[in-house]
Amino acid sequence: MHCPFCSATDTKVIDSRLVSDGHQVRRRRQCLACSERFTTFESAELVMPKVIKSNGNREPFDEDKLSGGLYRSLEKRPVSADLVELALNTIKSQLRATGEREVPSDMIGNLVMDQLKELDKVAYIRFASVYRSFEDIKEFGEEIAKLEK
């Protein structure tokens, strides 16, 4: 690690601690050349699979798009931001757990629907109506009937 003060390459770690619920390591370092101290944070770089769209195009996974869809479905619903973040992390973990380099967009949509079904039934219906392109009231009724079973 280069010292941010003198650019020397020799530094030593004085202290290491887990932060962010164990997902990050905070290290206190000291430069061996100028004796200045500084803090670094280390976390794993997790690679998300590419998304195969329904038209066959491939694009990088977009976390903002995923969270935007979840938050839009949950707009004005009594669900805490912490629960939404937990749902987002669950979806991302499930995608990484596939071990695939590419996943179809409908898989992501189904994972979102599974999470919304647990979080809020109204948000689930909102998302399903757009995701499945409901054409009329009958389709809403059928989806609601499935939820009530």
Curated annotation (Swiss-Prot):
Cofactor notes: Binds 1 zinc ion.
> What is one GO biological process annotated to this record?
negative regulation of DNA-templated transcription
Q: Where is the ATP-cone domain?
A: 49-139
Q: Where are the zinc fingers (unnamed)?
A: 3-34
Q: Do the record's keywords include RNA-binding?
A: no
Name the protein family. Answer: Belongs to the NrdR family.
Please explain the role this protein plays, according to its UniProt record: Negatively regulates transcription of bacterial ribonucleotide reductase nrd genes and operons by binding to NrdR-boxes.
Q: Which NCBIfam families match?
A: transcriptional regulator NrdR (TIGR00244)
The protein depicted here goes by the name Transcriptional repressor NrdR
Which species is the source of this protein? Aliivibrio fischeri (strain ATCC 700601 / ES114) (Vibrio fischeri)
Name of the gene this protein is made from: nrdR
